[in-house]
């Protein structure tokens, strides 16, 4: 596993929408995050299995193949990112997705149709702060 300083904020962004992925990557990078991106859940899992240990994971739920909740579940089962703040970012606001997210212990859930990158950043910071408290 990679060693990081206590002040480093590392985020893993996983979304199959490359435009949004790039927008969020720019926003978080400007806010001081070390950003890694993956345009598939398989790519995200490969990064984490390869030693990237994020302290925040921001994942889309609905993606081809394995969905974002399955990715979070796999990372947690393998204990690859202990203590990471996990936030689901999706166009879907279905009660089934929210229920699955809650059962997995996801820290936040953002419907992306109603948010812009600065709002997503603010919500991530809010959730990180409340989890540290």
Describe the residue ranges of each PLM region.
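Short amphipathic alpha-helix used as the core "switch/output" element in two-component signaling
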Residues: 46, 69-82
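Active-site residues of response regulator receiver
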Residues: 60, 90
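Helix N-cap/capping motif at the beta->alpha junctions
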Residues: 37-46, 68
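Active-site beta3 strand of CheY-like receiver
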Residues: 52-58
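Charged docking surfaces used in two-component/phosphorelay signaling
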Residues: 22-30
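Non-catalytic signal-transmission and effector/linker regions of two-component phosphorelay proteins
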Residues: 1-10, 117-133
């Amino acid at each position: 596993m990679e060693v990081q300083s206590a002040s480093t904020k590392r985020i893993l962004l996983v979304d199959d929408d490359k435009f949004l992925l790039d927008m969020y990557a720019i926003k978080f990078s400007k806010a001081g995050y070390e950003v890694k991106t993956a345009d598939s859940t398989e790519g995200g899992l490969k990064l984490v299995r390869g030693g990237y240990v994020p302290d925040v994971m921001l994942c889309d739920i609905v993606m081809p193949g394995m969905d974002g909740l399955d990715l979070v579940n796999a990372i947690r089962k393998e204990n690859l990112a202990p203590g990471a703040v996990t936030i689901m970012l999706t166009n879907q606001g279905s009660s089934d997705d929210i229920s699955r997210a809650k059962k997995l212990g996801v820290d936040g859930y953002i419907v992306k149709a109603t948010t812009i990158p600065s709002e997503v950043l603010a919500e991530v910071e809010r959730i990180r702060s409340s989890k540290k408290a």
